[in-house]
Structure formats: structure tokens, C-alpha cells
Swiss-Prot record:
Residues the entry annotates as binding Zn(2+): 406, 409, 425, 430
Every BRCT domain range: 589-678
Binding site for NAD(+): 35-39, 84-85, 115, 138, 172, 288, 312
Recorded catalytic activity of this chain's protein: NAD(+) + (deoxyribonucleotide)n-3'-hydroxyl + 5'-phospho-(deoxyribonucleotide)m = (deoxyribonucleotide)n+m + AMP + beta-nicotinamide D-nucleotide
Name of the molecule in the record: DNA ligase
Organism of this sequence: Pseudothermotoga lettingae (strain ATCC BAA-301 / DSM 14385 / NBRC 107922 / TMO)
Residues annotated as the enzyme's active site: 117 (n6-amp-lysine intermediate)
Length: 678
């Protein structure tokens, strides 16, 4: 069938428009259309390409949306080695670097370009006639993995440049702080291993063979290097940064041209103070000789260029002693080693415990009980042991043995597959797994049974009263009274009332509480909107699940594996028999007053929890996001607001108090309470 010419032209036009709007949004940070208008353009393109698949090209913007499951990453040789950088934390050493450069070049002063050192993953991107054809990881510096398909999901990487040049560039892929925190929060809810920092999260994301994982994690990029710059008439690094932005790449806006080393040091000191204001982690400043002809004269060693150096920020670091290393067992059986420390003050908080992530990490760092260690707060958030002070060992230190059995149930331990870094308890009846599963099930984001705390859960499981999560709905006053001291009649009555109330929990929260790996609240909402009942979800196939926007192959397999388990089906049957709400009717939106509006919330609200205000906004046709951007319409501000307020003010986003929001939507809080909606 011959394709009409006007269809071909429309598809080309749509691609050009979408790439132009990507450029304005990601590179210029100045969008001129709404998210809804952008989505309409993308949807039209997807539908046309679905109808005329022969017109689909590898560089079409639609390829960012589709999903692929790769067999493996092929290894490709870099056209030019990706070298590492020498680094220093010391002002005297940066002056020594400048002195050495000036001496070799026989110059009194040298122009430098200073760029923020992003805590991410280095990549090489190749374009032919302006079209993205290959993306490589750094690998060993000589060869890297072909991660082209994954990099296509990073929206700020252009698939078509604004000029038809053939060029290779290099840059950093990173995960914004809010996305990193969201991802770790999601993983915490489903008992997944947490990422230590955004760099690890980025690296782990880019290594995924299932491209849907990348699409569901918001990665970003900054490009900073052009291979063979003389081909494009570029004489300096400063010129190169301007040219990169001009042809469509996202370039860090905080780079600075410095006339001498004093200005470099001033820049470094300025960003030591200001780095916490950024929406991504940085760990220093990269200092580069500006002129390319000077770079050529200086050359490189086999490991690093002589014309550049990383000027690292001083870490928030403290010295302490490892008192003990204990092993915790999570809901899915993951064994996590935790260091108990002599308490230290670090970045305004007392640190007593630090996760050691896994046993490979302990072996790599050679951490022993009794060691003196340095603990840092990466990005000012997560404390971790970064190094051991081996010189201070006295011989009394003890190596921890990798467990050969579960510390709780003495069951077998092992790894699920060769790529699994986590050691797990393989006993399906391990009481530690059940305890953690119950904690997830009754947590605030799920059934929200406040009376079921950690200590009571321990007693219920240890006594044998609770053998699975559904058993809590069959507890009797007499059984609870037999648990011993501290369990009075009033407490029993309150607990049973809360358990009864929990039967009315919305389906998406029940799904969240089940703890299916990688299924957090967002995914649970998607599943609820699609299937509306547990029974329909139970009968869904992997293929059916992967057709749903936001559900990739890994999540789909986890869902299927979870519900295929006979024990799970028994639990679902018990929950249904107990009277839980396992079916959700179609939501009836009374008003569309917030249609097409996007909100964010910061601070503590007096009338609503975060979940309740989110539910209210959604019921009125609006959306609630976890972060503030130019596409956010309003930020609802409560008591003790966080960084979202500052960002909203900087972006000019409208602010509403809680009362102003209620007036805006014409809702009386008293009526809401009378209707028991909140």
C-alpha cells in the first residue's frame, strides 16, 4: 500500500516539533507549550507510526517511549580512550597544578574553564549527519558497553541534532536528587536493596537490559567534551560548551571562564557553600586549560590528561570505631550487614549505625569489627563507611564471616542468580521475612494500622498467632490477652477497632502492602486503575501487563511470580473472606475543576495527610507530582516547608496556603469530614 505524501510530511513535521520542544525544555529550560500539548504531539506521532510502521526510524522521538528487552550489551572500542582525572582536595595542590602547567607552557597566567563535577556516569555519544547512532559506557576506558537503546530513554539526549554534523561527544548521565530519593523510598517499601548514592543508582539503571526500567527512572545529562574540536572551528573549551548548547545538547549552566588560578579557587569555595542548593549531587569542580592548542602541548599520561584536574570538595567526614557488625533480614530475605558505631556527630545528626550494603562491600573495603573508619555523608544525606584506617589496627580486630545460614531461622542462604549481589535467606517460612512483611502490610502507605508496631508484631509471630499477613484479621480478644504483660483490655479493643477499620482500605493501598517486588504505590495505582480487582489481576499474563504504560517486563514478571505462588493465593482468599475491599469501583469524579493542573505539596498540612491531599486533587481531575518544575502550576504550602518552596519561588510557580487551596476548589472541610471522605 502506497503511503500518502501528506502522512509522510505530517510524521516528519511532528518529529521536528517534538525535538524542538525537547531542546527548549531540556537545553534552554524555557518550554513554550504545556506538558499536555507536548503529550498530544507525541501521541499523534505514536499512532501514525503504529499505522505506518515502515516509516519508523531509530531516531524518532517515539523510540524514547517504546520498550525493548536486550539479550546483552556488546563491547565496542572507544574511538579515543576515556581517561580518568587526577584529583586533589587541597588548595596548595591546585596551585601546584597551575604552577606546573604555566612552567610547561612558559606562560605567566593561564585561562581555565571550571565545570561542576557531577556525581554520575560518563558516556560517549556518536552522531552521524546529526543523528544519534551509538552510545557507550566508559567501561575500562578503552572499550565500553553499547548502551544506545538505554540512552535513548534519557530525554535530554537529543536523537537528532540541530545541525547535521558528524561528531562524538562525551558527558555525564546522572540521577536528580529527588528521583534518587523517590527510587530508594520505593525500594524501601518493597524491601529492595537501597542505592548508596545517585551515581550507583545511575550505573545500575543504565546496566538494565529491560529498557522500560530506564524509562521509569528519570535520568538526565550534561555534555562537556567534543572529540577533534578543530574540525568544527573550535579553539577553546569555552567555545566548545557554547557550540554544544547551540547544536542541541544540555550543558551545565554553572561553568565559568577563569582568567587565573585565583578565580578557580574562588569558584571552588563558592560551590562548597552553594552545592546543597542544586537538584543533583556534585562532588567537586573540574578544572580544564581553556585553549585546545595548550591542551595538545601538555598531552596526557596513559591514565589522565595533564591539562585537567578534579578539585574535589571536602567531604562531610568523621572518624569512629566499628563496635559490631550485625546482620538484618528483610521481607524478601535479603541479609544486610549493618555496622554499629561509636556515636559521632556528622552534618548535624548523630550517627550510630551505618548500612554496609552487602558482603561484597565489606570484603572490598576490608571492614572488620574494631576498625577505626571514616564515615561520610554523601550529598549530606546517607552516611556510609568510605575507608578503613588500616594503620591504626592493633591485631584485635575481627573479620566478619559471611553467613552460611540465616541468623534468624538458621535456614539456607544463597544468591538467586550469578548477578545478584545480595545474600538471601532461602527459607520461605523464615519468621524474620514474615515480620518485615507484616511491617510493610500495616505501614502508613498501606493499611495504616498504627497499633501494630514492631514489638507487637514480634510477639505475634514468635507466639505463633500470626503465620501470614492475613492472620491479623482473625485475631480474637482472648488470643491477644494471652500475649502477656503490657497487653491490656483497652489496648486490645483499640487494636481490633483499627484492624476492622483497615478492611475499608482502598485496593491500591492493599496492593502496595502486599510487598510485591518493585510494586510501590505508583505502580499499585496503575494496576488498580487497569484491573479494578485482585481477581482480574490474578488472571493477567506477563504480555498483558507489559502493555500497560509504566509496567516493564521486570515488574510484570514479579507480579506474575508473586500471584502464581500457592501460598499467596491462600492469603488472598483469607483476605477476601475477612471482608477486605479487593475490588474497586470506577471512580466518579464529581468535579473536573483541577483538570490539566499539576500540583506539588510541601510542609505539613493541618487538615490532610500527604496521601489525602493527593487523593483529593486527583478526584478533582488534577495531578500531584513529587517535585517542582516549570510545568508545575501550583505548590500547596503547609507548615515547615522544604526545598520545594525555594524552587517554586525561583521558578515563579504560584503558591497556595491550605486554606487558599480549599477556597480555590470551593470545598468546605467540614462537609468532607461529615461525609467521612477524609
Amino acid at each position: 500500500m502506497k503511503i500518502p505524501e501528506d502522512i509522510k510530511k505530517r510524521i516528519e513535521k511532528l518529529r521536528e516539533e517534538i525535538e524542538y520542544h525537547n531542546y527548549r525544555y531540556y537545553v534552554l529550560a524555557d518550554p513554550i507549550i504545556s506538558d499536555e500539548e507536548y503529550d498530544r504531539l507525541m501521541q499523534e506521532l505514536i499512532e501514525l507510526e503504529k499505522k505506518y510502521p515502515e516509516l519508523v526510524t531509530p531516531d524518532s522521538p517515539s523510540q524514547r517511549v517504546g520498550e525493548k528487552v536486550l539479550d546483552e550489551f556488546r563491547s565496542v572500542e572507544h574511538s579515543e580512550p576515556m581517561l580518568s582525572l587526577d584529583n586533589t582536595y587541597d588548595e596548595a595542590q591546585i596551585r601546584e597544578f597551575d604552577k606546573r602547567v604555566r612552567k610547561l607552557l612558559e606562560k605567566d597566567t593561564i585561562e581555565y574553564v571550571t565545570e561542576l563535577k557531577i556525581d554520575g556516569v560518563s558516556v560517549a555519544l556518536r552522531y552521524e549527519n546529526g543523528r544519534f547512532v551509538l552510545g557507550l559506557s566508559r567501561g575500562d576506558g578503552t572499550r565500553g558497553d553499547d548502551i544506545t537503546e538505554n540512552l535513548k530513554k534519557v530525554r535530554s539526549i537529543p536523537l537528532i541534532l540541530r545541525e547535521p554534523v558528524t561528531v562524538e561527544v562525551r558527558g555525564e548521565i546522572y540521577m536528580p536528587t529527588e528521583e534518587f530519593e523517590r527510587l530508594n523510598e520505593e525500594r524501601k517499601k518493597v524491601d529492595g536493596p537501597l542505592f548508596a548514592n545517585p551515581r550507583n543508582a545511575t550505573a545500575g539503571t543504565l546496566r538494565q537490559l529491560d529498557t522500560s526500567v530506564i524509562r521509569n527512572r528519570r535520568l538526565d545529562s550534561f555534555i562537556y567534551y567534543v572529540l577533534s574540536p578543530e574540525r568544527y572551528g573550535l579553539q577553546t573549551q569555552w567555545d566548545a560548551l557554547k557550540w554544544l548548547k547551540k547544536i542541541g545538547f544540555k550543558v551545565n549552566p554553572y561553568s565559568q571562564l577563569c582568567q587565573n588560578i585565583d578565580q578557580v579557587i574562588d569558584y571552588w569555595k563558592q560551590w562548597i557553600e552553594k552545592k546543597s542548593e542544586l537538584s543533583y549531587w556534585v562532588d567537586g569542580v573540574v578544572v580544564k586549560v581553556n585553549h585546545f592548542n595548550f591542551q595538545s602541548i601538555l598531552g596526557s599520561t596513559s591514565r589522565s590528561p595533564r591539562w585537567a584536574i578534579a578539585f574535589k570538595f571536602p567531604a562531610q567526614r568523621a572518624k569512629t570505631r566499628v563496635l559490631n557488625i550485625i546482620v538484618q533480614v528483610g521481607r524478601t530475605g535479603i541479609l544486610t550487614p549493618v555496622a554499629e558505631l561509636e556515636p559521632i556527630q556528622l552534618a548535624g545528626t548523630v550517627v550510630k549505625r551505618v548500612s554496609l550494603h552487602n558482603f561484597d562491600y565489606i570484603e572490598e573495603k576490608d571492614i572488620r569489627i574494631g576498625d577505626q573508619v571514616y564515615v561520610e555523608k554523601s550529598g549530606g544525606i546517607i552516611p556510609q563507611v568510605v575507608s578503613v584506617i588500616a594503620d591504626e589496627r592493633n591485631g584485635s580486630e575481627k573479620k566478619i564471616e559471611i553467613p552460611s545460614k540465616c541468623p534468624v531461622c538458621s535456614g539456607k542462604v544463597g544468591k538467586i542468580d550469578s548477578e545478584d549481589v545480595a545474600l538471601r535467606c532461602l527459607n520461605p517460612h523464615c519468621p524474620a521475612k514474615l515480620k518485615r512483611a507484616l511491617e510493610t502490610f500495616v505501614s502508613r502507605g498501606a493499611l495504616n494500622i498504627k497499633g501494630l508496631g514492631e514489638k507487637l508484631i514480634d510477639r505475634l509471630v514468635d507466639s505463633g498467632l500470626v503465620k501470614d499477613i492475613a492472620d491479623i484479621f482473625y485475631l480474637t480478644p482472648f488470643e491477644l490477652s494471652q500475649l502477656g504483660s503490657g497487653i491490656g483490655q483497652k489496648m486490645i479493643a483499640n487494636l481490633l477497632a483499627q484492624i476492622e477499620q483497615a478492611k475499608k482500605t482502598p485496593l491500591h493501598k492493599i496492593l502496595t502492602g502486599l510487598g510485591i517486588p518493585l510494586v510501590g504505590e505508583k505502580t499499585a495505582r496503575i494496576l488498580t486503575q487497569k484491573f479494578r480487582s485482585i481477581k482480574r489481576l490474578l488472571s493477567s499474563s506477563v504480555d498483558e501487563l507489559t502493555q500497560i504504560e509504566g509496567i516493564g517486563i521486570e515488574i510484570a514478571k514479579n507480579i506474575r511470580e508473586y500471584f502464581d505462588n500457592e501460598k499467596t493465593r491462600q492469603i488472598i482468599g483469607k483476605l477476601e473472606k475477612a471482608g477486605l475491599n479487593l475490588e474497586e469501583k470506577e471512580a466518579v469524579v464529581q468535579s473536573k475543576i483541577l483538570s490539566n493542573l499539576t500540583f506539588a505539596v510541601t510542609g505539613t498540612l493541618k487538615n490532610f495527610t500527604r496521601d489525602q491531599i493527593k487523593q483529593l486533587v486527583q478526584s478533582l481531575g488534577g495531578q500531584v507530582t513529587d517535585s517542582v518544575s516549570k510545568s508545575t502550576d501550583y505548590v500547596i504550602v503547609g507548615d515547615n516547608p522544604g526545598s520545594k518552596l525555594t524552587k517554586a519561588r525561583n521558578l515563579g510557580v504560584k503558591l497556595l496556603t491550605e486554606d487558599e487551596f480549599l477556597q480555590f476548589v470551593k470545598i468546605d472541610i467540614k462537609n468532607l469530614r461529615q461525609q467521612k471522605l477524609f
